[in-house]
Every structure is written in C-alpha cells, then in structure tokens.
From Swiss-Prot:
Name of the protein this chain belongs to: Beta-ureidopropionase
Domain CN hydrolase intervals: 72-344
EC number(s) stated in the UniProt entry for this protein: 3.5.1.6
Reactions catalysed, as given in the entry: 3-(carbamoylamino)propanoate + H2O + 2 H(+) = beta-alanine + NH4(+) + CO2; 3-(carbamoylamino)-2-methylpropanoate + H2O + 2 H(+) = (R)-3-amino-2-methylpropanoate + NH4(+) + CO2
Oligomeric form and interacting partners: Homodimer, homotetramer, homooctamer; can also form higher homooligomers.
Disulfide bonds: none
Originating organism: Rattus norvegicus
C-alpha cells in the first residue's frame, strides 16, 4: 500500500507519461475530459494561506431548446483532525468547527451551492477502538445539537445547502446512537436526516459496537439546487443502496466516507463512478485524510498485533457524472476542497441515451428478490439430469 508521501494517481501519471499517452490514459480512466473552473484569485489565495488544496472542474451537457441549463456547484471537503485524539472532546469539536468554517468560506467565494463534509466529520473516526468513552461524548442531536446549529449558521450565511454527517444521539428513542447525515437548507433550516443503511464488520471497522443499520430508508431531499441524497460510506459497496436513492429521484448522490488504503483504495475510483453510470445521476465521493492515533492499543480479532491507529485515510475525493466521466481526485495527503459545476440536464440526457431506467426490469427483480428472502427459498440452479443422459454404450 502506498504511504502518505504518495500524493495522487494523477500526479504520478502526469510525471511519468508523455502527453499523448497521458491523454489516452485519462480518456480511459476518467472518460470525457472535464473543463477546469476559473476559480476566483481571492479563493485560491485564501486556500493557500489556510493550507488546503483547492481544485475546480465542470461537467457540460448538450444545449436544449425546451430547458435552460440546470447549473449547480457542489463542494466536497476532505480534512484531517487538527488536534490529537487525546485532547478534550470540546476542544476537538471546536477545532474541527474552526477548520470547516475556514474551508466553507472559500467554498462560498467559489459559488458553491451544496457543500458536503466527510463521514463523522466533527470527531475522530474512533469506532475502531470499541471503547465507549470518550468517543460517545461526540454524539449530538441531529435536530438541534451544537454541530447542527453551527452548520445552520454556515448555510444561512453563505446561502448554501450543508450536508453534515455526524454521530447522532437520538434522545427521542432511548438515547441510541446512529451514523447520520443532517441536511440543512440554504435558508438555515434543518430539512431532515438520513442514516447509514449498511454497517461494516470488517477489519478494524467495529462500528456495530456503537450503532446499527439505519431505519430511515432512502430519503431524497428536494433542495433549491436539485434533488440530493446521501449514501454514507460503506453503503457504496451495495448497488441496491445507490439504486433506491435513484428510484426516489436523486440527481446527486453524495458518499461521505472514512476509509483506509489497505482496505479499499483500489475500489475507490470504481464504485461511485459505476453508480453514476448505472443510475443516470451525479455521484460525489469524499474521504477523510491522514492517520489518527488513539491512546490505547486495540485489536479486532484478525490476528494482527495490537495497534494505536485504524490506518491511513487516503482522501482522493472526486465527482462522477452519469455519462461515466469523472473529475481528477483531490490528493491523498492534504486537506482539500473540490468544487465541481454540474449541469443536471445531463441526467435526463443520458437516461434518454442509455435507457437503463426503462430497461432495468425492476418488476422482475422485485418478484425474484421477494422469493429469495423467504426462509424456504430454493435457488434457481439448473443441473444436469444424469438419469436422462445418453448411455456410453
């Protein structure tokens, strides 16, 4: 596995390939070339001063006679935790709020309409430890917790929709915990929330020690800037998860994540891009950055020696379009903001071209899946009938 000093696949290709070869490789890896956005000088200067990467790209669409372009700019934020995990909880939360506020201000300079933060952005991703304290103290109300109120102010100040993935404390239902994304309108009002539908039980991802599978289904939020959904982290491995957000009308599906190189880096460039193709929508994959060390060693029953960290979070956030094209990714080792301009007309244009929704045969799969989940289901396997086989004599 590449270490944190390896910046990105894009940098490696650009460094070692001749221009003609590079063009062909990018055509295959990234599809139709995206246009570079001309970002404001003051935004670029602010990003440099605040020590984070700022990149901007745009997807086009064919001009139509009956519809105006539906242009929306999304901002994906990837970042490391600014304080050690041993710092007091309140100080860690405050430091993360400050860091995100710095980045959100630059997003506003770039005209971002919808901004999404990484999974459990206001805390370390400490679920590997299986310890309850102090990590459960980061949990907050999705409706009126400290972090939600912070994001409401950001949303109203900058006139942008905010997607805020947090560890939720649901006090209306016994104080149980959920892995939740809060969606806040550009008016500053909480539109609602969605929960992580699939919980990993692999390696050090011991998340089911804290929370279980979400119970809110696949909600899609009708914002001023388009219909959006949030497929949290591990849910990207489940094609039906993406599908149901699309069935409910999502034009943009965000995938805020916290995943490490050893586990998933080779899968990362494929899954969200494939989902964009299969579901005729835009997908936005974002991942945290860096390595987080915990005071106490932990193990996960996988034969590895006790250790103090989960692994290296490799960033590499990107956006994919329904035509299969995608932006270059942000770096593997820097905080960053990826600004991407989308024309939502492309969703219908590609739907009309490839017709996956028309040819998807959902009724057939619904019928067969309804049978497959029954306890007495017998798989439809056709075997050779040896009784009817011709004799060798």
């Amino acid at each position: 596995m590449a270490g944190p000093e390896w910046q990105s696949l894009e940098q490696c290709l650009e460094k070692h390939l001749p221009p003609d070869d590079l063009s062909q490789v990018k055509r295959i890896l990234y599809g139709k070339q995206t246009r570079n956005l001309d970002l404001p000088r003051k935004a670029l200067e602010a990003a440099s001063e605040r020590n984070f990467e700022l990149k901007g790209y745009a997807f086009g669409a064919a001009k139509e006679q009956q519809r105006c372009p539906q242009i929306v700019r999304v901002g994906l934020v990837q970042n490391r935790i600014p304080l050690p995990t041993s710092a007091p909880v309140a100080e860690q939360v405050s430091a993360l709020h400050k860091r995100i506020e710095e980045i959100a201000e630059v997003a506003a300079m770039c005209g971002v309409n919808i901004i999404c933060f990484q999974e459990a952005w206001n805390m370390p991703f400490a679920f590997c430890t299986r310890e309850k304290l102090p990590w459960t103290e980061f949990a907050e109300s999705a409706e009126d917790g400290l972090t939600t109120r912070f994001c409401q102010k950001l949303a109203k100040k900058h006139n942008m929709v905010v997607i805020s993935p947090i560890l939720e404390r649901d006090r209306d239902h016994g104080g149980v915990l959920w892995n939740t994304a809060v969606v806040i309108s550009n008016s500053g009002l909480v539109m609602g929330k969605t929960r992580k539908n699939h919980i990993p039980r692999v390696g050090d991802f011991n998340e089911s020690t804290y929370y279980m599978e979400g119970n809110l289904g696949h909600p899609v939020f009708q914002t001023q800037f388009g219909r959006i959904a949030v497929n949290i982290c591990y849910g990207r491995h489940h094609p039906l998860n993406w599908l149901m957000y699309s069935v409910n009308g999502a034009e943009i599906i965000f995938n805020p994540s916290a995943t490490i190189g050893e586990l998933s880096e080779s899968m990362w460039p494929i899954e969200a891009r494939n989902a964009a193709i299969a579901n005729h929508c835009f997908t936005c994959a974002l991942n945290r950055v860096g390595q987080e060390h915990y005071p106490n060693e932990f193990t996960s029953g996988d034969g590895k020696k006790a250790h103090h960290d989960l692994g290296y979070f490799y960033g590499s956030s990107y956006v994919a379009a329904p035509d299969g094209s995608r932006t270059p990714g942000l770096s593997r080792n820097q905080d960053g903001l990826l600004v991407t301009e989308l024309n939502l007309n492309l969703c219908q244009q590609i739907n009309d071209f490839w017709t996956f929704k028309m040819t998807g045969r959902l009724e057939m799969y619904a019928r067969e899946l309804a049978e497959a989940v029954k306890p007495n289901y017998s798989p439809n396997i056709v075997k050779e009938d040896l009784v009817l086989a011709p004799s060798s004599g």
